[in-house]
From Swiss-Prot:
It comes from Picosynechococcus sp. (strain ATCC 27264 / PCC 7002 / PR-6). It is found in: Carboxysome. The gene is ccmK. The keyword DNA-binding does not apply. The lineage of its organism: Bacteria, Bacillati, Cyanobacteriota, Cyanophyceae, Oscillatoriophycideae. This is Carboxysome shell protein CcmK. The tight homohexamer forms a small pore which is positively charged.
Length: 112
């Protein structure tokens, strides 16, 4: 299973909160962080299986319009990010989000 990175950049903090909420509710992904870029630009970052991240980014994008003045500025998915990115950019699973990662990715069922 490939662990993808999905990003949604919005104009305004309320819009990114709406996007993040929709993203984690719509698919089995883990919210790993957000970045305030300046001028009201905020990016939310999720990790998970490629298909789940795709569904998550789509849901986040669709829900931003629910916020008065909310605007999607950009979205992007990286299917298999190079491991070096995890040590330089804020896309790594941290101890603080590990509990949520485990609830999103439960142990597979064993066949009897």
């Amino acid at each position: 299973m490939s662990i993808a990175v999905g990003m949604v950049e919005t104009l305004g903090f309320p819009a990114v909160v709406e996007a993040a909420d929709a993203m984690v509710k719509a698919a089995r992904v883990t919210l790993v962080g957000y970045e305030k870029i300046g001028s009201g630009r905020v990016t939310v970052i999720v990790r998970g299986d490629v298909s789940e991240v795709q569904a998550s980014v789509s849901a986040g994008t669709d829900n931003v319009s629910r916020v008065n003045g909310g605007q999607v500025l950009s979205t992007h998915i990286i299917a298999r990010p190079h491991e070096n990115l995890e040590y330089v950019l804020p896309i790594r699973y941290t101890e603080a989000v590990e509990q949520f990662r485990e609830s999103v990715n439960p142990q597979p069922l064993r066949r009897v």
